[in-house]
Structure formats: structure tokens, C-alpha cells
């Protein structure tokens, strides 16, 4: 280990930055956030330093580097574009036993500054020891995507409860189990983020009053249409905290590879070699696993509340008193149309969009007269088997037979395939396409030749 990672308490302590440019400004911003009493010494200063000085946030000393400025300091940073000046600052600080950072010269520095993920009071620092700053930045960005923005508020609130937890729970094991359920409670985190004091208090009292082996919870997560990059940050956080993930065939392998490694996985979809699990059985799986105290993620393709039967699953949980929450996903209509160069709305062609299921409840019938109206885009989910009927009904109710249509197979994935044609051909076109696929009907389909971008990459 070439460097010892430490966190310095700099509040109301003197620090010096030598340099007045953009790099010095970035370093100054960090020290000011840490509460340092800051002096900046340079020949010239960019405007931001003058603004800070006018607001009384720091002191500016214009002119060449003055060693005497180091005397009261705990820490210094050399951030000029002159290597000789930076070396001078480093040597002067070293002789006074003051830690000094030299920008872009780790060998000349007595400390280096890491990439920081700030969820105050929780802080995460990432460093490559100065050997690969880009790698450290990329790791920081990955951690930024994983750690919720409101995590700091949760940590702050946890600090306020420590005395109460210590008083109520006698053993270390009990305290550990309490904190484990505290830090994964989405309702509490969201209430803190919303500054909803009433909800925070209610959730807190529930956490303290329920047994430590209480029933678990279910999180309904939309996985998006296929491309793992379209999974939301909150969705990613949930699948990485799950004890068990119940998923269907519309969830891509790339997304399943992001699930916590030691989480149990239960496949409930339909594909070669598997039978479709009835919806009622899926409901019971969610209920049973949550009642064991597990954190259950029900992972669905697209958005769980758009033809995903998410509402039915939650009704079962609600009736049983199981806590639940929902993380929406990018629905297939949005993802597949965007990846196919098909804007769902357009001021010249479509002033509205309709999302329609092609899989009707027994005895159901669609409002074909309104669906056949002009100036709109229709998106049919699960419509391949009904393509001939969709064609027949729309034409019968007045839609032009030459209306452009597109069928998007495996949308947003590297296997995406788009078949174009006219409404009069829809039944035949559907025979060329395999599920999962969407049917898009409307004048906007005619823009595909101009706006298609995904296949060209």
C-alpha cells in the first residue's frame, strides 16, 4: 500500500492553494466544502476566486509564491501551470512538515486527492495512487450509479437513532438485524428524501415495533425493454439488494447478470423447455417468500404497470399486508420506437399515442372506431397472434389500407429486427416475426428511413 487513505478534519483550519486557474478553482471548491479557512496565492485569478473573496469565503494574496503563507497551514496544494513553482511549494511545505498535494505530479506530493463520492456524512474515496486517474474516475462513476443520492440523509438519520437502538436492543446481533432492515427500507429513504416528517416518524416507529424476524417486502421493478443500459439506477440498486429475484423471459440475460450474485433466482416465464407459470402461482411465490422475511424483487420486462399485470400481483400482497414498492421501467413502446427511429408523436403526423394490448380478456373487444382515427400512433403489445384481426378491424373501421406499420422484434437488443410494410400486409408481416415483438401503426413509421440510427451502429 503506497498511500494510507485518511479523512482529514479541516473545518476552521488554515489551508493554502497556490494557483489561480481552473484546476486551483476545483481544488478550492473541495476545501471550502470541507470548511477550511482558505488562502489562495497566485499572480492572477479567474473570476470565481474574486466572487468567493467578495463573499468572505476565502482570502486572496496576489503575487509570487510566498513561503510565509505556509506557516499557519495544516495542508497545501500546488496547482499552478509552472512546474518550478509547484516544486518550490512542495519543498517549502515538506520542510515545515505540512502535507502538500502537487497537481498532476504525484511523486512530488506528500498526499494525493482521490475521486470522491459524496453522500455526506457517508464518504467514499477511490484512488489509483496517481497511476491511472481515468480508471479511478470510471470506478467513481460506477459507484455513483449504485449508491442512492439520498443515502447521506439515511446515514444522518441513523446517527440520530443510535442511542435509542442501543437502549432497545440489548445484543449486538439484534442491533445488527435492526440496522440491516433500516438501511434497506425504501419507504423510509423516500420519506427522508421528500422531507416528509410524518411518514418518516411513522416508518421509524414501525421499524422499532415489529419483530426483527418480521415479514419481508416485495419490490416490483421494471427492467426496461432489453438493453441493460436502459435499466434505471433505482432498478439496479434494487436487484443488487435482493434476497430473491422472480423474473420472466422478457428480462434479458445482461440484466440478470447484474443481480446480486448470492440472490436466489426463480424463473416464471415461458420459453423452450419451460411451462408458463400461472399468474396466481406467481402471486403465491411472492407472498410466500416475503412471509419468510426475504427482500423479494419481482423483475418484469418493460414497465410493470403497462400490460405487465403488476397491479394484480400487488393486490395479492396488499390483501396479505405485505409491504411493497414499485420501481417503474422504460416501457417497450418507448424503448423499441426510439431504437427503431420511430417517434411516437410528431406535430405533423401524430398528436396522440395509444398503447393497446393485443391479448384481450375473454369476451373483450377494443374500441376499433376510435383506434382507426387519424393523427395518432397505435402501439400493440402482445399482438402478433392477433395481427390479422388488427388489420381487418382497423381497415373495416376506416383506417387507410396503406397506413405504414412496423413490427419490432427483440427491441433495443443486439438482436433487434424491424419489419416495415402497410396495414393491408400486417397479417402476413407478422408471420415473419417472432415474439417478443411490438406492432406500431401510424404515419410516423414513414420517418424510419430518415431517423433510424440503431442498426447503423
Swiss-Prot record:
Keyword Disulfide bond: no
Organism: Salmonella arizonae (strain ATCC BAA-731 / CDC346-86 / RSK2980)
A Pfam family it matches: CysG_dimeriser
Gene that this polypeptide is encoded by: cysG
Protein name: Siroheme synthase
Described function: Then it catalyzes the NAD-dependent ring dehydrogenation of precorrin-2 to yield sirohydrochlorin. Finally, it catalyzes the ferrochelation of sirohydrochlorin to yield siroheme.
Gene3D superfamilies, alphabetized: Cobalt-precorrin-4 Transmethylase, Domain 1, Methyltransferase, Cobalt-precorrin-4 Transmethylase, Domain 2, NAD(P)-binding Rossmann-like Domain, Sirohaem synthase, dimerisation domain, Siroheme synthase, domain 2
Gene Ontology terms for molecular function: NAD binding; precorrin-2 dehydrogenase activity; sirohydrochlorin ferrochelatase activity; uroporphyrin-III C-methyltransferase activity
Any one GO biological process: methylation
Alphabetized InterPro entries for the sequence: 4pyrrol_Mease, 4pyrrol_Methylase_sf, 4pyrrole_Mease_sub1, 4pyrrole_Mease_sub2, CobA/CysG_C, NAD(P)-bd_dom_sf, Siro_Cobalamin_biosynth, Sirohaem_synt_dimer_dom_sf
Record keywords, A-Z: Cobalamin biosynthesis, Lyase, Methyltransferase, Multifunctional enzyme, NAD, Oxidoreductase, Phosphoprotein, Porphyrin biosynthesis, S-adenosyl-L-methionine, Transferase
Amino acid at each position: 500500500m503506497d498511500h494510507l487513505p485518511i479523512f482529514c478534519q479541516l473545518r476552521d483550519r488554515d489551508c493554502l492553494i497556490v494557483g489561480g486557474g481552473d484546476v486551483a478553482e476545483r481544488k478550492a471548491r473541495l476545501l471550502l466544502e470541507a470548511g477550511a479557512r482558505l488562502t489562495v496565492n497566485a499572480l492572477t485569478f479567474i473570476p470565481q476566486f474574486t466572487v468567493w473573496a467578495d463573499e468572505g469565503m476565502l482570502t486572496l494574496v496576489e503575487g509570487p509564491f510566498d513561503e510565509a503563507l505556509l506557516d499557519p497551514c495544516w495542508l497545501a496544494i500546488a496547482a499552478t501551470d509552472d512546474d518550478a513553482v509547484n516544486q518550490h511549494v512542495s519543498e517549502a511545505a515538506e520542510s515545515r512538515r505540512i502535507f502538500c498535494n502537487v497537481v498532476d505530479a504525484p511523486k512530488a506530493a506528500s498526499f494525493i486527492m482521490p475521486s470522491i463520492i459524496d453522500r455526506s456524512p457517508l464518504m467514499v474515496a477511490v484512488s489509483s495512487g496517481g497511476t491511472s486517474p481515468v480508471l479511478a474516475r470510471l470506478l467513481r462513476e460506477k459507484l455513483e450509479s449504485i449508491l442512492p443520492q439520498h443515502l447521506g440523509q439515511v446515514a444522518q438519520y441513523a446517527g440520530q437513532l443510535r442511542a435509542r437502538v442501543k437502549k432497545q436492543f440489548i445484543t449486538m446481533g439484534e442491533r445488527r438485524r435492526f440496522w440491516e432492515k433500516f438501511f434497506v427500507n425504501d419507504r423510509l429513504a423516500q420519506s427522508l428524501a421528500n422531507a416528509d416528517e410524518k411518514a418518516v416518524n411513522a416508518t421509524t416507529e414501525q421499524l422499532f415495533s415489529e419483530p426483527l424476524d418480521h415479514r419481508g417486502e416485495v419490490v416490483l421493478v421494471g427492467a426496461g425493454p432489453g438493453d441493460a443500459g436502459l435499466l434505471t439506477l433505482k432498478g439496479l440498486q434494487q436487484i443488487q439488494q435482493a434476497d430473491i429475484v422472480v423474473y420472466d423471459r422478457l428480462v434479458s440475460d445482461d440484466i440478470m447478470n447484474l443481480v446480486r450474485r448470492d440472490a436466489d433466482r426463480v424463473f416464471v416465464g415461458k420459453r423452450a423447455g419451460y411451462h408458463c407459470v400461472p399468474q396466481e402461482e406467481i402471486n403465491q411465490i411472492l407472498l410466500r417468500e416475503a412471509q419468510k422475511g426475504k427482500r423479494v424483487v419481482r423483475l418484469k420486462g418493460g414497465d410493470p404497470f403497462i400490460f405487465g399485470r403488476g397491479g394484480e400481483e400487488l393486490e395479492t400482497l396488499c390483501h396479505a399486508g405485505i409491504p411493497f414498492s414499485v420501481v417503474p421501467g422504460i416501457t417497450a413502446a418507448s424503448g423499441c420506437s426510439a431504437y427503431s427511429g420511430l417517434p411516437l408523436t410528431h406535430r405533423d403526423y401524430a398528436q396522440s399515442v395509444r398503447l393497446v394490448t393485443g391479448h384481450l380478456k375473454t369476451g373483450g373487444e377494443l374500441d376499433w372506431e376510435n383506434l382507426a382515427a387519424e393523427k395518432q400512433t397505435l402501439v400493440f403489445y402482445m399482438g402478433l397472434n392477433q395481427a390479422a384481426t388488427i388489420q381487418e378491424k382497423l381497415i373495416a373501421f376506416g383506417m387507410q389500407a396503406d397506413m405504414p406499420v412496423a413490427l419490432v422484434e427483440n427491441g433495443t437488443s443486439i438482436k433487434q429486427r424491424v419489419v416495415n410494410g402497410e396495414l393491408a400486409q400486417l397479417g402476413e408481416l407478422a408471420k415473419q416475426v417472432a415474439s417478443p415483438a411490438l406492432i406500431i401503426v401510424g404515419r410516423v413509421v414513414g420517418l424510419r428511413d430518415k431517423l433510424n440510427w440503431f442498426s447503423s451502429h
